[in-house]
Design a protein with these regions (language model features):
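N-terminal pre-domain/capping segments
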Residues: 1-110
Length: 111
């Protein structure tokens, strides 16, 4: 049976860089990490191949398992969590969410 490691989300560490957050999670004794998109901390629209390589290296170095990539709930609007959602009646808004989820899948494949 597949065991999901006890993990911590980088969403709670947004004042650190994503690399610093990986080290902080490892230092705290967690086995896994949720890499959470955040406008200033881990912005899916600004992720480079270099950063993905650095993330892979930090995870490997610290023995941390990436448990999840989180697409944010407040990424597009602070006033309405989860909007635009996949159920948004506005087609352009729904396409924004779909694009964000696709970016999360690509990041998951890369790390």
């Amino acid at each position: 049976m597949l065991k999901l490691p006890l993990s911590y989300s980088t969403f709670g560490l947004t004042k650190l860089s994503v690399i610093e957050a990986i080290h902080a999670v490892a230092d705290a004794g967690y086995e896994g990490i949720e890499l959470a998109f955040h406008k200033t901390h881990f912005n899916p629209f600004n992720i480079t191949d270099q950063l993905l390589g650095d993330i892979r290296a930090a995870l490997r170095e610290r023995g941390i398992v990436p448990a999840c990539i989180s697409s944010p709930t407040h990424f597009f609007t602070d006033e309405r969590p989860h909007e635009p959602s996949l159920f948004c009646t506005d087609i352009a808004g729904r396409k924004q969410r779909i694009d964000l989820i696709r970016r999360a899948v690509k990041v998951a494949q890369a790390v």
